[in-house]
Swiss-Prot record:
Assembly and oligomerization: Heterotetramer of two alpha and two beta chains.
Organism: Pseudomonas savastanoi pv. phaseolicola (strain 1448A / Race 6)
Residues that hold substrate according to the record: 152, 178, 189, 276, 400, 405
Superkingdom classification of source: Bacteria
Gene Ontology cellular component annotations, sorted alphabetically: cytoplasm
Protein keywords: Acyltransferase, Amino-acid biosynthesis, Arginine biosynthesis, Autocatalytic cleavage, Cytoplasm, Multifunctional enzyme, Transferase
Subcellular localization: Cytoplasm
GO-annotated molecular function: glutamate N-acetyltransferase activity; L-glutamate N-acetyltransferase activity
CDD domains in UniProt: OAT
Protein name, as recorded: Arginine biosynthesis bifunctional protein ArgJ
Site positions (Involved in the stabilization of negative charge on the oxyanion by the formation of the oxyanion hole): 115-116
GO BP annotation list: L-arginine biosynthetic process; ornithine biosynthetic process
Pathway where this protein functions: Amino-acid biosynthesis; L-arginine biosynthesis; L-ornithine and N-acetyl-L-glutamate from L-glutamate and N(2)-acetyl-L-ornithine (cyclic): step 1/1; Amino-acid biosynthesis; L-arginine biosynthesis; N(2)-acetyl-L-ornithine from L-glutamate: step 1/4
Length: 405
């Protein structure tokens, strides 16, 4: 069940960025599970990657190659090529070499990405056999098809698009993502691809995707697990007839930053809305922190708590579980007598105790909604952070218990 996530919005084509989809039958015969993306010559490419120590073979290669000349991005679903050791690296290189051979580029110009089951050998021959069909399918209009092609346990494709005008020239930013479980990005299973036709230097582009991911992909969590394969890529094709952005300042940069951040936020929140088994979309706001980190610590303590997440699923306003999570978040010298907690607009705890105005009926009414905000006021300073998460349902357990069957 996707919470408040409807059909894909219009995904505007990005000049200089093409996508092609084909079937390798990695997990299911006939399933479109290979996506090739082609960047125009001269494009800048930047990315952020998982910090999981068991990062997948394609992540290792993509991190090594991203600052060089990049022409193609190759994604397969159904197999993560993680936990596969040196043979996994060999397999990832082979798929890149085959695509390079078919297109006449150097193998180092191909960045690989994989998502799916961890620990199984990558079916190289199947992927190689699907590459020509993906190349034949390349089109700037294939964003929606690619959004479907990168899905695993997702129930709906995810994408967003923005356009703005600068000096009479229209700039486009379009992105897609996948992910529904094993979601607590930290680079940053989550993959994101965003492209723009603006011309941007690689260093500025890298800072842009790092900051954009930090405020979006790095603020979502479904189950607290950081995948071995997480990455988010930002490509600037430079096809728009405007000067290159070489500094993080000025009206053009500011407009591009807003568009990129908006797309990041949309596709990141779409991952939460489509979380495995999710029936609630939950915003955890933490205000009044002494610093950003303690706000994040409190937010994640609440967002990761199985007791809170199951209470959300049951629409049970068990506010004591929220207080307990705040108390164990590790905030030094926390004065609980200054803490207020709200469910939606209802104050459920004031100065560390049940609010005198609170009734169970008020809490139950808020918890029955599909979209819920938990707001925590720490009373320690001026810092704030926001995390987005889900409830924890029977369906989440079922999906993950049956994942390999």
């Amino acid at each position: 069940m996707a919470v408040g996530l409807g059909p894909l919005p219009a995904l505007h084509p990005v000049p200089g960025f093409e996508l092609g989809i084909s079937s390798a039958g990695i997990k299911r015969p006939g399933r479109k599970d290979v996506v090739v993306m082609r960047c125009a010559e001269g494009s800048s490419v930047a990315g952020v990657f998982t910090l999981n120590a068991f990062c997948a073979a394609p992540v290792i290669l993509a991190k090594q190659r991203v600052q060089g000349t990049v022409r193609y991005l190759l994604t397969n679903t159904g197999n993560a090529n993680a936990g596969t050791g040196e043979p996994g690296l060999v397999a990832a290189r082979r798929t890149c070499e085959k695509l390079a051979q078919l297109t006449g580029v150097d193998a180092s110009a191909v960045l690989p990405y994989s998502t799916g089951v961890i620990g199984e050998p990558l079916p190289v021959e199947k992927i190689e056999g699907a590459l020509q069909a993906a190349l034949d399918d390349l089109s700037v209009d294939n964003w929606a098809a690619a959004a479907t092609g990168i899905m695993t346990t997702d129930t709906l494709p995810k994408g967003a698009s923005r356009q703005f005008t600068h000096d009479g020239v229209t700039i486009t930013v379009t992105g897609i993502s996948k992910g529904a479980g094993m979601i607590r990005p930290n680079m940053a299973t989550m993959l994101g691809y965003i492209a723009t036709d603006a011309k941007v230097s690689q260093s500025v582009l890298q800072d842009l995707i790092r900051d954009g991911a930090n405020k979006s992909f790095n603020r979502i969590t479904i189950d607290g697990d950081t995948s071995t394969n997480d990455c988010c890529m930002l490509i600037a094709t430079g096809q728009a007839d405007l000067p290159e952005i070489t500094e993080a300042k000025g009206p053009l940069f500011d407009a591009l930053k807003k568009a990129v951040f908006d797309v990041c936020m949309d596709v990141a929140q779409a991952i939460v809305r489509d979380g495995e088994g999710a029936t609630k979309f939950v915003t955890v706001e933490v205000n009044g922190g002494g610093n950003q980190q303690e706000c994040l610590d409190v937010g994640y303590a609440v967002a990761h708590s199985p007791l809170i997440k199951t209470a959300l699923f049951a629409s049970d306003p068990n506010w004591g579980r929220i207080l307990a999570a705040v108390g164990r978040a590790g905030v030094p010298d926390l004065d609980v007598s200054k803490i207020d907690v709200f469910l939606g607009g209802v104050c459920i705890a004031s100065q560390g105790c049940r609010a005198t105005t609170y009734t169970e009926e008020q809490g139950s009414a808020v918890m029955a909604e599909e979209e819920i905000t938990i707001r925590i006021e720490l009373g320690r300073g001026d810092c704030s952070e926001t995390i987005w998460t889900t409830d924890l349902s029977h369906e989440y357990v079922k999906i993950n218990a049956e994942y390999r069957t």
